[in-house]
Amino acid sequence: MDYSFDTTAEDPWVRISDCIKNLFSPIMSENPGHMPLQPNASLSEEDGTQGHPDGNPPKLDTANGTPKVYKSADRSTVKKGPPVAPKPAWFRQSLKGLRNRASDPRGLPDPALSTQPAPASREHLGPHIRASSSSSSIKQRISSFETFGSSQLPDKGAQRLSLQPSSGEAAKPLGKHEGGRFSGLLGRGAAPTLVPQQPEQVLPSGSPAATEARDPGVSESPPPGLQPNQKTLPTGSDPLLRLLSTQTEKSQGPVLKMPSQRARSFPLTRSQSCETKLLDEKTSKLYSISSQVSSAVMKSLLCLPSSLSCAQTPCIPKEGASPTSSSNEDSAANGSAETSASDTGFSLNLSELREYTEGLTEAKEDDDGDHSSHQSGQSVISLLSSEELKQLIEEVKVLDEATLKQLDSIHVTILHKEEGAGLGFSLAGGADLENKVITVHKVFPNGLASQEGTIQKGNEVLSINGKSLKGTTHNDALAILRQAREPRQAVIVTRKLTAESMPDLNSTTDSAASASAASDVSVESSAEATVYTVTLEKMSAGLGFSLEGGKGSLHGDKPLTINRIFKGAASEQSETIQPGDEILQLAGTAMQGLTRFEAWNIIKALPDGPVTIVIRRKSLQPKETTAAADS
């Protein structure tokens, strides 16, 4: 039986398609170029095969092929297989060639280099020279198809090498088109990235010549050079290149933009106070003046040498502040009796500041304040520049008498402290809470605010270090308070909430506070409290009611009471609790002295299930007063 390729009989167990027969038939694969045993001829033939950039296979096999002469040798080599093979031997050889060629084009950038060792191995085959030649032709076809499929790989490598700036010609001899050495060049410092406009000077980052080359263009050339470099980086590029570019920007950013960061932190303009939506024009003028004074004073303090006492800051007398007054302030601050007070800080209200800005040097005879207040006013005036003083005088002259009276309740407090030290008070309220006005929640006994004495509990905080707190949320106000820890000086503008100033700020909240106070007095005078212990079911939505009151609430320090019971909740169906009930204990935790936010955190932390609550209920609850309190 003849098992040669010319036979038309097929293996009944293996179905071979027509395309595979035509592709791997000896008639298609034979060509006279591969038959001579000279290695030079075979090398030139393979070089010619692999040299096609478009990947088209050579046509020498079909045009000049004379396979009939070598058909006997072909049969002698192929007949060595078993009588019934699952697959022909030439098919297995082609699969082996596929596996051998699978990893070569990926490891080497040039696909022509992968098939050069094939002729050398073909010389030592001996009697199997025809089978190896047929398999080599199959390998050539496979490599030609792979070359056609990967014809864009060198272009991608060129694009990756062109990711560097305009110094591409200088980077090519260093990289030598090798992936390992190119990544190593980036790992050693990426000098072309740092100096994009000088390609011929490729030096290490630590050399003095490189630093001298970078110094003339530090302020202008590196940022424009880095920006187009970042724009040309695709999403799938080398992450090391992106990391180096971002690190150079971060390292140069603080050095180049220190004055601008300070100007943004403490602006001289009134943009923050003007952007906030105020309730009245009078209050807007007050807020703008206070914000302007605090920002100007804070900026002046930061420009001066950092010191702990006000006496060490150089004071320039302007408009009523004489050199004798500044010397008196120095002597008073250096006195042993008042060392702690002078080191802590000082404050004055805006009415005193207005008198000094208008040039009223005789304010000492009219005012009842002591000598230290006048020294504080003069020291604040000395901190302001002439342009800021002129702008402040123009704004003060426009104010009417009713607004000028409110200047007495606004105080500018300057605290001298160590870096990282707190201001000595906490904040309550915010735009996102029930109490919209941000006030002083607590003054710590041994803090700076307590030692200075101006900032009291319940005062409204207008601005801290030139940053207005009007209309800010509670978290934003806390962030501004934390930022005040870093400088050595802190400028706080506060306002005492008197009975006269409350209608101007929040007339609705004032009426609600008076109504709730009247209701509390009427209930307490005519009712007796009864303590109940109830059990409610805690669900994912909570206990089914909302709270009001608490420490630091809108109406002051009030007990935590139930404000409203939600519809559909278990507490509404059981009717065990009512609006107005005071919560004494919640799951064994005492609720006295807690804020509403802290109480809600305790409720959220409780696990789902029954919760025991101790409440206090008035035995006699007038409906009129409770309705007024809820409104």
UniProtKB/Swiss-Prot annotation:
Pfam families: PDZ
Residue stretches in coiled coil: none
Keywords: Chemotaxis, Cytokine, Cytoplasm, Nucleus, Phosphoprotein, Repeat, Secreted, Transcription, Transcription regulation
Chain intervals with Polar residues compositional bias: 322-344
Domain annotation PDZ: ranges: 411-496, 533-618
Composition bias type Low complexity, residue spans: 132-144
Segments for region (Disordered): 30-269, 317-344
Phosphoserine: modified positions: 221
Region named Interaction with PPP1R12A, PPP1R12B and PPP1R12C: 405-501
Family annotation (Gene3D superfamilies): 2.30.42.10
PROSITE patterns per UniProt: PDZ
GO cellular component, one term: nucleus
Annotated InterPro entries: IL-16, IL-16-like, PDZ, PDZ_sf
One GO MF term: CD4 receptor binding
GO biological process: induction of positive chemotaxis; leukocyte chemotaxis
Cytoplasm recorded as keyword: yes
Protein role: Interleukin-16 stimulates a migratory response in CD4+ lymphocytes, monocytes, and eosinophils. Primes CD4+ T-cells for IL-2 and IL-15 responsiveness. Also induces T-lymphocyte expression of interleukin 2 receptor. Ligand for CD4. Pro-interleukin-16 is involved in cell cycle progression in T-cells. Appears to be involved in transcriptional regulation of SKP2 and is probably part of a transcriptional repression complex on the core promoter of the SKP2 gene. May act as a scaffold for GABPB1 (the DNA-binding subunit the GABP transcription factor complex) and HDAC3 thus maintaining transcriptional repression and blocking cell cycle progression in resting T-cells.
Subunit architecture: Homotetramer. Pro-interleukin-16 interacts (via PDZ 2 domain) with PPP1R12A, PPP1R12B and PPP1R12C. Pro-interleukin-16 interacts with GRIN2A. Pro-interleukin-16 interacts with GABPB1. Pro-interleukin-16 interacts (via PDZ 3 domain) with HDAC3.
Protein name: Pro-interleukin-16
The organism of origin for this protein: Chlorocebus aethiops (Green monkey)
Gene designation: IL16
